[in-house]
Amino acid sequence: VDSLQHYLQRTYPFCYNNDFQYPHLGGEFLLQHAVGACREETDFMIYLLRTMGIPVASDRYIYSPDAFLGHSWSVFKDTTGSFIPTELLRTGVSREWNNRRRKGKVYREQTIPQKNSGSLFGSKLTDVTTDYYPTNQVVISSLQRKGKEKEGLVGVFSMNGWVPVGKYIWQNNRAVIENIEVGGLIYQPLRMNGNRWIPSGYPFLTDEEGRATSLIPDTIHTETVTLTRKHPLTQYWVDI
């Protein structure tokens, strides 16, 4: 896979373009018209690896507050049974792969519906967050249960509002999230109101140990500040 990727990086002039919304394109079309976004890159890599008999799939996150977009990439199964992520024109092949984007949750696309996918985005997406981050359990201690509510959603910040990326469930009157990216990422509990998502509690920040700190505003002791940037300049953008 590493040799194939290096060959493609030298000979396959893929033109990144996310201005258009394509259906899934065939391998022959992508070979002749090397254009599209990360999904088209991923599809082309999947076509190639499957012709070589290498087990391969597509992983994705729904939305990153760092990059302001969703993203997908290919993962192939190595001889140890582990799935190794790789991106066609961006990264090499490494078990220590890290594209440094905030992900929140990671999902794997399946070709057939899964009965117990555990995903709120449909039966063809399976939650594989633990392939990228250690298993954890985050408790939102400040969240108040509404009636007999069994579960709710958690989202991340976007310029157009909060975007759901996962869910929490109620266990012994505690709101619990299973397996999310922790450390420096702000999440927002959400519920549906009409046709839009609205906050159902205070946003919270997690530390590296998975402890959640709710960001509750102090309405008594106030300060006046000038806001010049709504979102921090992350290391991902600095490196670019």
Model-predicted regions and their roles:
Residues 1-2, 6-7, 18-28, 32-131:
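Hydrophobic/aromatic-rich core segments of domains that either
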Residues 130-140, 233-239:
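Contiguous beta-strand segments within globular domains
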Residues 136-145, 225-229:
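A short, amphipathic beta-strand motif
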Residues 144-161, 233-239:
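Short, ordered, surface-exposed loop/turn motifs in non-cytosolic proteins
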Residues 159-175:
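Short, acidic Ser/Thr/Gly-rich low-complexity loop/linker segments typical of extracellular
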Residues 173-196:
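Short Pro-Gly-centered beta-turn/loop motif in secreted/extracellular proteins
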Residues 192-221:
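Structured interaction patches on ligand/partner-binding surfaces of diverse proteins
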Residues 214-240:
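Compositionally biased low-complexity segments at domain edges in trafficked proteins
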